């Protein structure tokens, strides 16, 4: 849902994309939180935020786009190592597709979490997306 207007994001808006070779460093990756074994669980909870670059947002007609992935895993990875592997694999997947869009970034993260990185239990996606109104 668009946070600015409250309208549902349409399929053409979500599939609108840019070729990967047209934009340098299209995505920013940060780990905003890493909870190690909270509440005596045998899982770590890692929150990764993926931000779209200014040039990518300009091409897609987006004012703001943050994708927040809350990941439950039984691994006990170092925070920097997990981020490096996650970032590299997502960019690799997008380079193989050749197009960066909102849907493709979500698909890439899903592929990395459940097919590449072992022991992922669950992933919850929240987003902050605002399209340009004008």
Swiss-Prot record:
Q: Which Pfam families match?
A: Gemini_AL3 (PF01407)
Q: Which UniProt keywords apply?
A: Host-virus interaction
List the GO biological process terms.
Answer: viral process
Does Protein biosynthesis count among this protein's keywords? Answer: no
- Domain of life of the organism encoding this protein: Viruses
Q: What does this protein do?
A: Increases viral DNA accumulation. Enhances infectivity and symptom expression.
Q: Which family does it belong to?
A: Belongs to the geminiviridae replication enhancer protein family.
Q: How does it assemble?
A: Homooligomer. Interacts with the replication-associated protein (REP). Interacts with host proliferating cell nuclear antigen (PCNA). Interacts with host retinoblastoma-related protein 1 (RBR1), and may thereby deregulate the host cell cycle. Oligomerization and interaction with PCNA are necessary for optimal replication enhancement.
Protein's UniProt name: Replication enhancer protein
Native species of this protein?
African cassava mosaic virus (isolate West Kenyan 844) (ACMV)
């Amino acid at each position: 849902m668009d946070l600015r207007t409250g309208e549902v994001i349409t399929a053409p808006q979500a599939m609108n994309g840019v070729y990967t070779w047209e934009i340098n460093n299209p995505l920013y990756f940060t780990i905003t939180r890493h909870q190690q074994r909270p509440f005596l669980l045998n899982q770590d909870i890692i929150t990764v935020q993926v931000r779209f670059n200014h040039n990518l947002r300009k091409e897609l007609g987006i004012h703001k786009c943050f994708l927040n992935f809350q990941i439950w895993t039984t691994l006990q990875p170092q925070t920097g190592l997990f981020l490096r592997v996650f970032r590299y694999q997502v960019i690799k997947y997008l380079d193989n597709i050749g197009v960066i869009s909102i849907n493709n970034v979500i698909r890439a993260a899903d592929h990395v979490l459940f097919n590449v990185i072992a022991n992922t239990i669950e992933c919850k996606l929240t987003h902050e997306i605002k399209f340009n109104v004008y």
